[in-house]
């Protein structure tokens, strides 16, 4: 540690806060001086509208691509039912984390909630699952961005676009949280405008047809609504997740919210309402244009099919490319914000190297965490390119982001249930109207979605990749970082204080 971050001698601290036990076994905490946290300070910059845009922007690329492969897996009916099931899971989760983010407004988000419920080990596991989701996803998205850019500038190598987009958007994130969130608002509104233009155009032009929605030939035992039978619903679940994946990143902005107690629940709830509406319009209208569900379900650019069916094949390549890029850029930009905060919070608490969490002196943004995540993302982009985007590794990385997300969903809702039982008197400025029953339903649906992700054979490499990374990080935790945790990190401090008070009550 640098001299201004020296640990405070244990004798000057309460003895009861030096160690922690539970599902994790013994952990050891170091007590740091005030300068440590001062060098890791975030700036409050967000009201609920900017938070809403952060959440919706992170997800909105899922309305542009990815979801449509569920048509090939389950047909329109299978994907529709799967999307509704997944929507119930997300609503249950959003209400649960709205309550937790108001009660525990820390930058750690899911890691903080699970750490307070089950201790450092499972808290760290949830944090690592978030790292997988938020670091891998931008790498996959930037490859799609570069592919679109190459249609306009074929002479420019793909890697130039990867580097350029990472430099631009990591740079924006590093220049200030308020700038980051305002840019996020602009690109999110642009992406929503593109979708709304498509919705109106599909209906007004007559391009949409219900016959096209149900044009996938049914297999034996299937129907026009469920061409692949009831199993098609199960197989389509991972693709329904694309419509909502990453709304859960919002609690990571708690320490940068002007009033997390009121703004965070409001932004989360309005965010999921917005995404529910967009998902249904996209699913129905985009499935019924062009060559219908049969063509859209196999396309890498389903929205492009939609716009061509409205405006004709002569629609300019530039217009279609810009339209597609808005959604991709919105998610790329906002998920960079997310990985920066996950790495920052885990580093500040000592789970990963502490130097990563130092913030910039003037803007108080986690610039080191942003750069580290960006370098890893770029490395993954080069890896995917070298081995082929359709290769086992490329597909595995896509699956890892979804698999990591679903693991974190199950853990956070189980944490909600545990905290409701073990800490009933914890101040909860906002309470989920669904309460524990909602969290139970959400947990069950998350586990079903986890099973669906594992059941698809092509997803197995991603499942293995996630498991390997989790095991490596857990070994790192037990061998090294569990002895280096920081007692004054907000996520740890609240849990340690509760543990100390519980110990006093027992005596």
What feature does the model see in each segment?
Residues 41, 183, 356-364, 406-458:
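C-terminal membrane-solvent junction of multi-pass transporters and transport-like membrane proteins
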Residues 64-161, 271-277, 281, 408, ...:
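Extracellular loop-to-transmembrane helix junctions
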């Amino acid at each position: 540690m640098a001299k201004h971050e020296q640990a405070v001698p244990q004798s000057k601290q309460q003895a009861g806060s030096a160690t922690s036990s539970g599902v994790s076994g013994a952990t050891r905490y170091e007590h740091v001086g005030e300068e440590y946290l001062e060098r890791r300070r975030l700036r409050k910059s967000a009201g609920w509208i900017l938070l809403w845009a952060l959440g919706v922007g992170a997800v909105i690329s899922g309305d542009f691509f990815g979801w449509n492969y569920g048509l090939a897996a389950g047909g329109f009916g299978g994907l529709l039912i799967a999307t509704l099931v997944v929507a119930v899971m997300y609503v249950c989760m959003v209400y649960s984390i709205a309550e937790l983010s108001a009660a525990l407004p820390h930058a750690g988000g899911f890691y903080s909630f699970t750490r307070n419920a089950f201790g450092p080990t499972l808290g760290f596991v949830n944090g690592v699952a978030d790292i997988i989701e938020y670091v891998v996803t931008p790498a996959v998205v930037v490859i799609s961005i570069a592919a679109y850019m190459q249609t306009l500038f074929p002479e420019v190598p793909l890697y130039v676009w990867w580097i350029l987009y990472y430099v631009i958007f990591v740079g924006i994130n590093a220049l200030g949280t308020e700038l980051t969130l305002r840019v996020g608002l602009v690109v999110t509104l642009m992406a929503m405008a593109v979708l709304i233009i498509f919705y109106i155009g599909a209906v007004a032009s007559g391009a949409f047809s219900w016959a096209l929605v149900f044009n996938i030939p049914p297999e034996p035992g299937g129907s026009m609504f469920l061409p692949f039978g009831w199993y098609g619903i199960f197989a389509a679940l991972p693709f329904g997740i694309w419509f909502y994946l990453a709304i859960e990143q919002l609690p990571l902005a708690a320490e940068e919210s002007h009033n997390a107690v009121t703004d965070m629940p409001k932004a989360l709830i309005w965010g999921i309402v917005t995404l529910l509406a967009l998902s249904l319009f996209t699913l129905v209208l985009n499935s019924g244009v062009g060559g219908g569900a049969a063509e859209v379900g196999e396309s890498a650019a389903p929205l492009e099919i939609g716009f061509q069916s409205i405006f004709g094949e002569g629609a300019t390549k530039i217009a279609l490319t810009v339209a597609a890029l808005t959604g991709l850029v919105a998610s790329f930009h906002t998920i960079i914000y997310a990985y920066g905060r996950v790495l920052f919070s885990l580093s500040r608490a000592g789970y990963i190297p502490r130097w990563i969490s130092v913030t910039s002196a003037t803007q108080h943004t986690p610039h080191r965490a942003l750069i580290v995540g960006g370098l890893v993302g770029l490395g993954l982009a080069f890896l995917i390119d070298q081995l082929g985007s359709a290769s086992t590794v490329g597909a595995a990385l896509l699956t890892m982001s979804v698999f990591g997300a679903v693991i974190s969903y199950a853990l956070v809702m189980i944490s909600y249930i545990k905290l409701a039982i073990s800490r009933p008197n914890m101040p909860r400025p906002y309470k989920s109207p669904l309460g524990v029953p909602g969290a139970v339903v959400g947990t069950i649906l998350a586990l079903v979605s986890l099973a669906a992700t594992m059941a698809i054979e092509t997803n197995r490499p991603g499942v293995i990749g996630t498991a390997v990374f989790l095991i490596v990080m857990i070994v790192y935790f037990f061998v090294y970082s569990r002895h280096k945790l920081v007692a004054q990190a907000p996520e740890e401090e609240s849990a340690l204080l509760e543990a100390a008070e519980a110990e006093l009550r027992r005596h």
